[in-house]
Amino acid sequence: MSSEIVPIAEPIRPADGGLGAAHASVAVPKGGHWWFRLLAFLGPGYMVSVGYMDPGNWATDLAGGSQFGYLLLSVILLSNLMAIVLQGLSARLGIATGLDLAQACRARYPRGINLALWGLCELAIIACDLAEVIGTAIALKLLFGIPLTLGAIITALDVVLVLLLMNRGFRALEAFVMALLLVIFVCFGIQIALAAPPIAAVLAGFIPRAEVVTNPHALYLAIGIIGATVMPHNLYLHSSIVQTRAYPRTDAGRRSALRWAVTDSTVALMFALFINAAILILAAAVFHAQGRTDVQEIEQAHALLAPMLGVGLASTLFAVALLASGVNSTVTATLAGQIVMEGFLRLRLPPWMRRLLTRGIAIVPVVVVTWLYGEAGTARLLVLSQVVLSMQLPFAVIPLVRFVADRGLMGALVAPAWLVRLAWVIALVIVGLNLKLLWEFALG
């Protein structure tokens, strides 16, 4: 990637992005109690948090809990703190400039680099969609006995859901996503209560221990957790959807909006921390505690939960949460895809066409691999999707950090020096760990 940031060569309006009529469509109270302003800003953070608990993260958390107990909870906490910083920067970019990350790249980079960044981001969205197809198909099989191949094809029908929600406005999208997040929260809350993990051991797991880096198997899983935590398309998504709020486009209005937006995303990502930690805690309390350190796949975990906990409801709750996770990811991935395509290319497709195109590309490998290699093949395909996401991540993080440090672009909301330094450290850690993960993957 070129190190030069070129001046804006063409005017870019916020309406050029993927929000359309949703731009500044959510009213923000100008007075009254602070609680009402907070409620007005709640939503984008929860949309973003979906990417931190999608089906692609489940296998890593399950493997970490079953193999190492509560050891890797500290890694989940660390990766979540990294995500909070980067998503805060994404919101800062959108609020300060009125541009999303894709628009900022188009404005500041030459055409060739933009096309490359767009292609890489589209690849990441397809990889994310691949994980959603697999997760949703597995959930349909676990709940209704639908074969994986047929379940993967059925997921194409989610375009109807996306269309219905988009036609009802952006707040309807947010409400739907938050309702399904609540379903996931309740499902795992009940499962954790049934598993009754030792509180002292859980709390101790959040304290970093040397074994995380001295044990090569634990380190490998730790890299996987961190590498899969920050979804590249989330950085594009967040910088766009924070602009749905009708805050005053003045320095004071933007500063206030930034405070509320960061509060929203921080609280939402702590919610995601609970879900990811709950998956690992469940695996540790049920599988690791009883000597089953080999549980790494979603279907395997589902099959073992009921007999090992002695409660049939546990497996059902697990599958319901998985289905909610897959459906939720569908909504946010569709929106991110529109934002990326319209931001980089100024190419606007109808949402149903965009959704069918992306989902169609994702369904084909799932159907083919399931037909040729069975369910074990889909598990490997799920891992591959996370590796593809890891490959794209640096190409979203690095432009973001460079932009928020540019006073000419950000104006009064330029990121402070300490935050920029912290962001570069996080970026280097993520890039380094992803490179190591890719190297390990290449070596088998």
Curated annotation (Swiss-Prot):
It is a multi-pass membrane protein. It is found in: Cell inner membrane. It comes from the Bacteria. Its main location: membrane. Keywords: Cell inner membrane, Cell membrane, Ion transport, Membrane, Symport, Transmembrane, Transmembrane helix, Transport. One of its GO terms (biological process) is iron ion transmembrane transport. GO terms for cellular component: plasma membrane. The chain crosses the membrane at residues 31-51, 68-88, 115-135, 146-166, 175-195, 212-232, 267-287, 303-323, 356-376, 381-401, 413-433. GO terms for molecular function: cadmium ion transmembrane transporter activity; manganese ion transmembrane transporter activity; metal ion binding; symporter activity. H(+)-stimulated, divalent metal cation uptake system. PANTHER family: NATURAL RESISTANCE-ASSOCIATED MACROPHAGE PROTEIN 2, SOLUTE CARRIER PROTEIN FAMILY 11 MEMBER. Belongs to the NRAMP family. This is Divalent metal cation transporter MntH. It comes from Xanthomonas campestris pv. campestris (strain ATCC 33913 / DSM 3586 / NCPPB 528 / LMG 568 / P 25).
